[in-house]
Amino acid sequence: MGSGISAEDKELARRSKELEKKLQEDADKEAKTVKLLLLGAGESGKSTIVKQMKIIHQDGYSPEECLEFKSVIYGNVLQSILAIIRAMSTLGIDYAEPSCADAGRQLNNLADSTEEGTMPPELVDVIRKLWKDGGVQACFDRAAEFQLNDSASYYLNQLDRITDPNYLPNEQDVLRSRVKTTGIIETKFSVKDLNFRMFDVGGQRSERKKWIHCFEGVTCIIFCAALSAYDMVLVEDDEVNRMHESLHLFNSICNHKFFAATSIVLFLNKKDLFEEKIKKVHLSICFPEYDGNNSYEDAGNYIKSQFLDLNMRKDVKEIYSHMTCATDTQNVKFVFDAVTDIIIKENLKDCGLF
């Protein structure tokens, strides 16, 4: 009698081999998957980083997708000019041109009656007139004393272009548009043979409780902090300085037990706005003990040290930091390349190959 393998055994062996191959393929794919968590306080630029990933590592924004942002941009313009006009009353600032008081009242009436996300000609005329007023500009210069979108002057200075009947938002317009992030937004893309899953979560206090669901298996955290927020208060609590809130949040994340083995990269964002602001507003408004030079370099390095000094495990955990401008595609591309290299290096370390 021969001891040949039965057809059934052969089939079982074939299936077993197929399963092993599938498991190995899944393991290889998982090893190449990077779970990236974007954290930071509200309005620190996280969502702009996500948009940049679409521009840099996906196919960018199609004309149709850009057009979808038109109503968001118009909404941002209206919110911005309304915020300035309301702040004039709060701060006791008068219009330079008395006739602008009527324009201010007209703005409020039109804002109530205009369909959301549209910009009819009479509304454009009123906004244009108000934005040219010296009193409105004086109020804008005190924007740190009230809540105003960073993109306010960008859009208002280009009102004629963005209200043209044939207006199609460009990538910079899209990058500067602001919609509050609620919940968790996932973006997938590939870089240097790695598959990224990037999670952007809402930064306002009410949104943070949702972060916990993203914690497991995170490869890297990018923490965004707005350099320019050193003289500003929170949207949700006007008693709390935004920079102090950001430091408090960073402290809780970089020293959290969940992230003991997670790479952390600090994006000190909005460096362009910070460079302009530091010429006018001393850093001591946020850090009373600071008596250094009020230059971009010295003040920026001081803020960086405030964050990095919070790391309680400096001997075993390095925190990588970069000064960034999230609306500058080339800057984000350069910095994200560096982040990818850090992730590759850390993965090699984990495998004992570095």
Curated annotation (Swiss-Prot):
The keyword Amino-acid biosynthesis does not apply. A lipid is attached at G2 (N-myristoyl glycine). Residues 196-205 are annotated as: G3 motif. It is found in: Cell projection, Cilium, Photoreceptor outer segment; Photoreceptor inner segment. GO terms for cellular component: heterotrimeric G-protein complex; membrane; photoreceptor inner segment; photoreceptor outer segment; plasma membrane; synapse. Residues 35-48 are annotated as: G1 motif. Residues 265-272 are annotated as: G4 motif. Residues 7-28 have a biased composition (Basic and acidic residues). In the retina, expressed in the rod photoreceptors. Pfam families: G-alpha (PF00503). Residues 1-28 are annotated as: Disordered. GTP binds at residues 40-47, 175-181, 200-204, 269-272, 326. Residues 32-354 form the G-alpha domain. GO terms for molecular function: G-protein beta/gamma-subunit complex binding; GTP binding; GTPase activity; metal ion binding. Residues 173-181 are annotated as: G2 motif. GO terms for biological process: adenylate cyclase-modulating G protein-coupled receptor signaling pathway; background adaptation; camera-type eye development; cell morphogenesis; cone retinal bipolar cell differentiation; detection of chemical stimulus involved in sensory perception of bitter taste; detection of light stimulus; detection of light stimulus involved in visual perception. Its main location: other. Mg(2+) binds at S47, T181. Residues 324-329 are annotated as: G5 motif. CDD domains: G-alpha. PROSITE patterns: G_ALPHA. Keywords: Cell projection, GTP-binding, Lipoprotein, Magnesium, Metal-binding, Myristate, Nucleotide-binding, Sensory transduction, Transducer, Vision. G proteins are composed of 3 units; alpha, beta and gamma. The alpha chain contains the guanine nucleotide binding site. Belongs to the G-alpha family. G(i/o/t/z) subfamily. Guanine nucleotide-binding proteins (G proteins) are involved as modulators or transducers in various transmembrane signaling systems. Transducin is an amplifier and one of the transducers of a visual impulse that performs the coupling between rhodopsin and cGMP-phosphodiesterase. This is Guanine nucleotide-binding protein G(t) subunit alpha-2.
